[in-house]
């Protein structure tokens, strides 16, 4: 997936991002066309990238939230009590999803190690986070303007 923010972040880290179709990635790693790839642990294990790469660094530079969404029409049709149930179910779903993602990642890291990959976890994540944040804002400043970016930054 070619994502402008990811491209800017990796360029800022000194890499030369090379977007390509995912089905081409394994052979590109195998042939040395690219030196690395960026994917969730579950994708790395499913693709058996341990066959074509030796290292994986768990930088935590991307967080992909999963939102629970509902239309105003649906929510407006619920009673106050039902909206409360909906909110409780959404929170429970979020907690269960996060727990499952963590479980899958832990199992995936173990599988990577079992298959000979060196998993690097002792990483100073602050520089990665700062570069990713800066890239996120810089990519969209021209499109939306500095004032909008500052309003977004102010949201907690």
Ranges and model annotations:
Residues 1-156:
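N-terminal secretory/targeting leader peptides
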